């Protein structure tokens, strides 16, 4: 099963605009029906539809694998995220935790922006569109206290991240054209610089895309502005490994990790360390979806990079002296991410200029 038994030869090329739309929209349609069954408390139907959604999203990576080295990583991320959404809905269904809106002001704003949602019968549509589920309560995810951004601040952040992304992209392109192939023929500091640049490239791309969706979807009423938390927060103020992963990075996916990984592991073992390991393992699978469709196999770099984090958190708790230095965690994360993490994965699987490596 994914990702270890994926056969690169089992490609599913899709031709024709109608077939492409059918393959892309069918997993989304089954998830919407699953959400409908969730609000009707039909557990068996919800479980069956969850299985169908996961299988369809899983196969979509094989569909896109035939594209080769083209930039289709966003599709892998989208379907990996859809799998987590579907699994979370199924888990909540069996725990009888059907959510509801908990903010009267937000309820009225949603109904004003989405006039087709007039009563509770259409809650499943609103819940499916609210990807991060903020503004909902299901007695599982603790309230997340955050600063709600204004639309002006969203626009400013979008411009900053897009500009920084373009600058790093130009630098990366010049560096990749100047480097020798294979990469091992270059000095070690050039290799590290290129991998670290790759990590920044991915970081800025994700942030720019996130805020671009914000300035488009908020005016259209698809998502409420209160549902947009800060993406990775203010990393410069991060003081510990735990802060980086639990507050800055996983702020958008924490509701899914808690329901699918944290709570079941705590119930079975009672160990917070094992629960943390299960969350990072799930995160590694989710990130691996982005490049599995391109490479045709999983990357051990993701699993090493993420599964080492619980040990760093545990080490930090045992050695209080480490918490006094605010930037050591950022240095460690950058080195791990750049030398044997996202940078290596991007280097091997993403850019056509280095596809021969």
From Swiss-Prot:
Pfam families: MBOAT_2. It is found in: Mitochondrion membrane. GO terms for molecular function: O-acyltransferase activity. The lineage of its organism: Eukaryota, Fungi, Dikarya, Ascomycota, Taphrinomycotina. It comes from the Eukaryota. This is Uncharacterized membrane protein C3H7.05c. One of its GO terms (cellular component) is mitochondrial membrane. One of its GO terms (biological process) is lipid metabolic process.
């Amino acid at each position: 099963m994914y990702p270890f038994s994926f056969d690169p030869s089992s490609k599913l090329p899709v031709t024709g605009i109608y077939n492409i739309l059918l393959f892309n929209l069918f997993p989304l349609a089954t998830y919407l029906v699953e959400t409908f069954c969730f609000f009707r408390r039909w557990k068996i139907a919800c479980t069956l539809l969850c299985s169908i959604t996961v299988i369809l999203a899983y196969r979509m990576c094989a569909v896109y694998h035939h594209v080769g080295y083209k930039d289709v990583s966003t599709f892998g991320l989208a379907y990996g995220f859809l799998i987590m959404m579907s699994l979370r809905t199924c888990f909540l269904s069996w725990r009888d935790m059907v959510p509801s809106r908990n903010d009267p002001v937000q309820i009225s704003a949603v109904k004003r922006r989405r006039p087709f949602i007039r009563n509770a019968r259409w809650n499943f549509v609103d819940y499916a569109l609210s990807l991060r589920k903020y503004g909902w309560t299901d007695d599982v995810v603790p309230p997340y206290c955050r600063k709600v951004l204004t639309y002006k601040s969203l626009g400013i952040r979008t411009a900053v991240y897009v500009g920084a992304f373009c600058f790093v992209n130009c630098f990366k392109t010049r560096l990749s054209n100047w480097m020798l192939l294979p990469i091992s023929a270059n000095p070690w500091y050039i290799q590290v610089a290129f991998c670290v640049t790759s990590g920044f490239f991915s970081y800025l791309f994700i942030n720019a895309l996130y805020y671009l969706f914000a300035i488009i979807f908020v005016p259209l009423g698809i998502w409420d502005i209160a549902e947009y938390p800060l993406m990775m927060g203010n990393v410069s103020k991060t003081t510990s490994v735990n802060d980086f992963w639990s507050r800055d990075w996983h702020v958008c996916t924490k509701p899914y990790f808690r329901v699918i990984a944290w709570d079941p592991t705590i119930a079975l073992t009672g160990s917070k360390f094992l629960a943390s390991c299960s969350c990072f393992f799930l995160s590694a699978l989710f990130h691996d979806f982005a490049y599995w469709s391109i490479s045709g196999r999983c990357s051990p770099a993701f699993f090493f990079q993420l599964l080492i984090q619980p040990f760093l958190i545990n080490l930090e708790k045992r050695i209080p002296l480490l918490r006094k230095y605010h930037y050591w965690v950022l240095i460690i994360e950058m080195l791990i991410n750049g030398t044997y993490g996202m940078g290596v994965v991007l280097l091997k699987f993403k850019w056509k200029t280095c596809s021969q490596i």
